[in-house]
Regions:
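Acceptor-binding helix/loop patch of EC 2.4 sugar-transfer enzymes
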Residues: 14, 77-94, 135-170
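Membrane-proximal helix-turn-helix segments that form the acceptor-binding/catalytic region
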Residues: 31, 102-106, 142, 158-181
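A conserved catalytic-core segment of Leloir-type glycosyltransferases
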Residues: 46-105
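Short, charged/polar "capping" segments at the starts of alpha-helices
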Residues: 49-56, 126, 190-193
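Short N-terminal targeting/anchoring amphipathic segment
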Residues: 104-123, 133-135
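A short beta-strand/loop micro-motif in the catalytic core of glycosyltransferases
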Residues: 116-117, 177-186
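Carbohydrate-associated surface elements
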Residues: 188, 204
Length: 205
């Protein structure tokens, strides 16, 4: 049984953890499950469609509170257009939401969290200026992933991906400075980011 003075951890995610189809969803779910054994957990996350919420009970089992914000694809694509003027990676702009920021700020105003755990680079900007101790699960280097994709593309698509790669390089390195610790799953990703606060924790550990 959890005590009333137990420490609180806030998880911030761009993707609902169920169904467990992708690696980052599995990492998020396992971390919530493990952290909930000793701490009170709150999750704030986007979801894309109602079918995902059929599994809501599976995550509520481990969370004191779950805050859900629906992500509408049309607004995400509009954000990508504006990213050209912000010099911001498209993958970051895709997940920008005034409603998400509002809900997050409300959570932070009514609860005192001892740690904020953000999942993926695309969500980092939401907590950039929050003084609470912060950890980001980068999972892997998005800059490295994009550089690999560039090699397999041609024409206009290659040019777009090359531009995104350039933006991600700067953004990813700056992002790690906003957090007390950044986590990746392999040494290759750590070396590519090359920041002193990056720690390697393989999947399943």
């Amino acid at each position: 049984m959890k005590s009333s003075d137990e420490k609180k951890v806030l998880f911030v995610s761009g993707r609902f953890p169920f169904p467990l189809h992708k690696g980052d969803q599995l990492v998020l779910f396992n971390n919530i499950r493990l952290v909930s054994q000793k701490y009170k957990v709150t999750l704030i996350t986007f979801y894309d469609n109602e079918s995902e919420l059929e599994n809501l009970h599976k995550i509520k089992k481990y969370c004191e509170k779950v805050v859900l914000i629906k992500r509408f694809a049309i607004f995400s694509y509009i954000n990508i257009i504006f990213s050209l003027f912000r010099l911001e990676p498209m993958q970051v702009s895709y997940y920008r939401s005034g409603l998400f920021k509002k809900k997050l700020n409300l959570l932070l105003s009514v609860d005192r969290f001892d740690l904020i755990h953000v999942y993926m680079l695309r969500m980092a900007h939401y907590v950039k200026d929050i003084p609470t101790p912060k950890v980001i699960g980068l999972i892997d280097s998005m800059h490295l992933n994009m550089s690999r994709r560039v090699l397999n593309e041609t024409g206009l698509k290659k040019a777009i991906f090359k531009y995104e790669e350039w933006l991600l390089k700067s953004y990813e390195n700056n992002c790690t400075e906003w957090f007390d610790r950044s986590i990746v799953v392999s040494k290759i990703d750590k070396e590519y980011i090359n920041n002193h606060n990056v720690k390697v924790i393989p999947v399943g550990v």
